[in-house]
Amino acid sequence: MALSSFSQIILPSPGMAALIRKARDELVSNAENGPSEYLSVHIRRGDRLGMTWKYHNTHVPTSLYVDAAVETWQRLNPASDSPLFYVASDSPEAVEDFLDQLPSNVRVTSLGWSSDEELRGIASPRSYVQEEFNTLGEEERIQLTKGMIVDFALLAGFWIKEDDPDARPYATVCGLRYSTALESLCRHVC
């Protein structure tokens, strides 16, 4: 219900819809047998720190994202031997670290690794810190916000029409700021 409400009430502008379409087309081109499902991963760095006792005031280790992504893929798609991950992050270094730790059979795409210059141009060039963002010029803030919206659309599968053959996320691995002693990583099956 919430997904359909969000997707029908909050709509991207035509320009944003074109960027989302371009990113989805590239994602589909990375799928082995045409449109398929993929696992999305969101790694937040910058001023977002962990709140659990284990990772209080530090970033959740990238290795936990890798372990959660691989385990989720194996659990939900045991017959697949070539997983496709979409990785969104405010930190190019976090994406590199994530890629370095993955098994070689995993295919990965992200805005920063796009073959399209316009998509690479909206990828976050550095970890997000709100105070720094507030000091940026308007055009840079607009570009970074566009990247966040495209990442959001691919992470969550928003704005895909029911009959659209696009690749869809079947699960998302992300770090959350829990105030309880729950594990820092969530595995949310969309």
Each model region followed by its residue ranges:
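Mature hydrolase/peptidase catalytic cores and their serpin-fold inhibitory cores, especially
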Residues: 95, 132-153, 157-158
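A donor-sugar binding/catalytic signature common to diverse glycosyltransferases
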Residues: 146-190
